Amino acid sequence: MNIIVSQEIASVCPTFVGAAVEAQVVNTPYSEALWEEIHMLEERFRQELTTESLKDLPGIAATRRVYKACGKDPSRYRPASEQLIRRMLQGKELYQIDTLVDLVNLASIAFGYSIGGFDADKFVGDTLTLGVGREGEPYEGIGRGMLNIAGLPVYRDALGGVGTPTSDHERTKMTLATTHLVVLINGYDGDEGRVAANARFIQDLLRKYAKSDGGTVTLYHFPS
């Protein structure tokens, strides 16, 4: 899998660094041990954060800055990591989908980065390009219907958009049948060490909960 960071992204976030975790996996409907980890993190965050202070977490603050630079309101189109942590802090249960989705959500919450998880066999072509959404560009967000992605950072394959920091696309979403996983970590704060640590954390989760060897990690930035 080749990943290209476009000049569009570099112009609003020259220090962007991403990480791709690619692995063979086995998905399951539910993992009790994984949810024990999620609940432990929920308890800690409820003691340490508020719905206002979470906006200052480096990964979230940097993503919000990029949204504003691209002309998008980050309070209307919240980054996924902010959505998840905000929901926890409001005392609401996180959505339980399946082990892979839940695992990616945990990784996003733990580090504050917006992370996309994809069924890599659904990509068209062997290259993803990170650019900025255009007016009128069709995009069906998972569980959200048609989403206006103009001004949102977006990964595109040969057919079109597959992932934004707000919502990934229905076409390439993970399911119980997914065996070839790609997870993309978006480090708009430019902290390569923390992005790499997030990738290693995901590898550990895959080993524990998805019958995987953890796969491989590739870091990417501009110029690609």
Region roles according to the model:
Residues 1-224:
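Charge-biased, low-complexity intrinsically disordered regions
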